[in-house]
């Protein structure tokens, strides 16, 4: 039976273990074009704290009782999608679950076989690293010899710069 971490209550200050709950989910059959992933890595990112509040922002807040959304890396274990075969390693946004049925809405990406740990695709080779890289080189147009100041409060992206 698949399991997922849900947001049980909205944190007051620092999130506490009591704000979350590990729950059993009903088993899902695969639809055409979907595949099942056994997750090996889940991402816990700074932006998630803001989504735990019930306020309007650039992304909707997490819904109480729903599985936490976020990046994950896992292995395809069953597939009805010709682009994804059992054994493929994928990055997706189905979130904090041990197993997930993936469709296009989870934005799956098959990961290349590189000599880096696969969890690297959740940070330095993922959204955080890409934002740092393109922000520094394309937006700021930093060049060799430039001095760059990165605030101590720059968060995950700043730490990747």
Predicted segments with their positions:
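Short structural boundary motif marking the start of a folded domain
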Residues: 1-5
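Conserved hydrophobic "DFG−1" position in protein kinase catalytic cores
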Residues: 6, 27, 78, 101-102
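Short glycine/threonine/proline-enriched tight-turn/helix- or strand-capping micro-motif at secondary-structure
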Residues: 14-26
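N-terminal Rossmann-fold NAD(P) dinucleotide-binding loop
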Residues: 158-159
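NAD(P)H dinucleotide-binding glycine-rich loop of Rossmann-like/cofactor-binding domains
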Residues: 70-75, 85-152
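Glycine-rich beta-strand-centered segment in the early N-terminal region that forms part
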Residues: 26-44, 52-96
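Short polar catalytic/cofactor-binding loops
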Residues: 7-13, 42-44
């Amino acid at each position: 039976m698949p399991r997922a971490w849900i947001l049980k209550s909205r944190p007051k200050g620092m999130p506490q273990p009591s704000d979350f709950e590990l729950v059993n989910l009903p088993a899902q059959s695969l639809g055409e074009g979907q595949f099942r992933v056994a997750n090996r890595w889940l991402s816990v990112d700074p932006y998630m704290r803001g989504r735990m509040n019930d306020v309007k922002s650039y992304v909707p807040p997490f819904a109480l009782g729903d599985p936490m959304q976020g990046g994950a890396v896992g292995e395809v274990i069953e597939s009805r999608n010709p682009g994804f075969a059992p054994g493929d390693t994928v990055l997706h946004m189905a979130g904090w679950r041990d197993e997930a049925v993936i469709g296009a809405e989870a934005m799956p990406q098959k990961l290349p076989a590189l000599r880096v740990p696969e969890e690297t695709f959740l940070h330095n080779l993922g959204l955080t690293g890409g934002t740092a890289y393109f922000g520094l080189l394309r937006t700021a147009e930093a060049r060799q010899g430039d001095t760059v100041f990165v605030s101590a409060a720059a968060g995950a992206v700043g730490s990747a710069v």
